[in-house]
């Protein structure tokens, strides 16, 4: 199964404290850490009846459009990725070596054996969410099963909170069909038409 997990307001939800601690654990220190700490320690004021109230700290959000934000988000997300890679209960496919996930922006493309692993995956994401602020948006997430077994498909469908994509799933602009022989028609031909327009 492939699960494309969409984050709920990915950049907006990351907790500053967790981000700074993660950077420190990864060996980022000195001037760079001080700059990040300063930029991501904003405060806000509310003006009520023309009177400025006491400032309060903003504790979450990596700034949209800020050049280091995608990198900072990826560094924070790597904590979850490492936990997934190291979790023995989460089974993965073998392509020369075990492949559990592929990360890009706020989507995690996760490839695994659903019957054994989905519960543990959701548990890890839930635990990570509590400390980092990262949450998944189930309506934005898709599961794609590479099986023609209807019984197995029904069982999996009942056990996961994601929408099931029946024929194909789109990842990084490429359509991944259920049948690999359709990959050329689904993606390559379509992309070539778009390029030649």
Across the structure, where does each feature detected by a protein language model lie?
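Nucleotidyl polymerases of mobile genetic elements and RNA viruses
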Residues: 1-197
């Amino acid at each position: 199964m492939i699960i494309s997990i969409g984050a709920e307001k990915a950049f907006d939800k990351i907790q500053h404290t967790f981000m700074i601690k993660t950077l420190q654990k990864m060996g980022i220190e000195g001037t760079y850490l001080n700059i990040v700490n300063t930029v991501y320690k904003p405060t806000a004021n509310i003006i009520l009846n023309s009177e400025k109230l006491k400032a309060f700290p903003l504790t979450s959000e990596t700034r949209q459009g800020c050049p280091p934000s995608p990198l900072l988000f990826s560094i924070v997300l790597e904590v979850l990725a490492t936990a997934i890679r190291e979790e023995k209960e989460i089974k993965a496919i073998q392509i020369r070596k075990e492949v559990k996930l592929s990360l890009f922006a706020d989507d995690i493309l996760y490839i695994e054996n659903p019957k054994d692993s989905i519960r543990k995956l959701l548990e890890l994401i839930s635990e990570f969410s509590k400390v980092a602020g990262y949450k998944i948006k189930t309506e934005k997430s898709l599961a794609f099963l590479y099986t023609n077994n209807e019984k197995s498909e029904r069982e999996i469908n009942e056990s996961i909170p994601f929408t099931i994509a029946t024929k194909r799933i789109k990842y990084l602009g490429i359509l991944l069909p259920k049948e690999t022989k359709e990959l050329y028609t689904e993606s390559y031909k379509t992309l070539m038409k778009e390029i030649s327009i």
